[in-house]
Amino acid sequence: MPHSSPGAPLDPVAFIHSQIRTVPDWPQPGVQFRDITTLLQSPKALRILVDLFVERYVDAKLDYVAGLDARGFIIAPIVAYELSVGFVPIRKVGKLPYKTRSESYDLEYGSATVEIHEDACKPGDRVIIMDDLIATGGTMMAGRNLLQRLGAEVVEGAAIIDLPDLGGSTLLRNAGLTVYTVTEFSGH
């Protein structure tokens, strides 16, 4: 049973938040990078994090968990495994070997493209889409659009961290995507 192990924190969300390292001025001055590697290095924190997602989605009747390249690939397959559903990778352009569908999205300076195999899911499949964090929301929006173009029902967008000051979670919600994040950090 989730969180029943000895030494489990009384507030799992606060514990997860405390396990995320902030690296100032990386990758550029003024950015407060939220580093999940410290969370992942702790077996206790990783178990609690996975349990939080599993508890949320255990009764959602999902067919797949989709993960966004690259840090979404860390947690999404673990959650898919725990839920006994498939994992769908949504990759940066040119990384998938079979026939793909692609979706471009805007970045602060330029644009990027993600792809999905055209047979990754079928119409009516219920899917959540996961990443490590939501900043501007562009990558998750592109992933959602790809899944919907394949006919999937995108149940929710999920991430470990929300950076609400960057507006991504609001953008996604305004576009009709329900969003769940474990914790949030203010600022950039």
UniProtKB/Swiss-Prot annotation:
Pathway: Purine metabolism; AMP biosynthesis via salvage pathway; AMP from adenine: step 1/1
Compartment list: Cytoplasm
Keyword presence, Cytoplasm: yes
Keyword match Secreted: no
GO biological process, one term: adenine salvage
GO cellular component: cytosol
Primary localization class, coarse: cytoplasm
This protein's UniProt keywords: Cytoplasm, Glycosyltransferase, Purine salvage, Transferase
One Pfam short name: Pribosyltran
CDD domains: PRTases_typeI (cd06223)
Broad EC category: transferase
InterPro entries per the UniProt record, alphabetical: Ade_phspho_trans, Adenine_PRTase, PRibTrfase_dom, PRTase-like
EC number: 2.4.2.7
Catalytic activity annotation: AMP + diphosphate = 5-phospho-alpha-D-ribose 1-diphosphate + adenine
Family: Belongs to the purine/pyrimidine phosphoribosyltransferase family.
Subunit structure and binding partners: Homodimer.
Listed HAMAP family: Aden_phosphoribosyltr (MF_00004)
Function of the protein: Catalyzes a salvage reaction resulting in the formation of AMP, that is energically less costly than de novo synthesis.
Protein name in the entry: Adenine phosphoribosyltransferase
Species annotation: Burkholderia cenocepacia (strain HI2424)
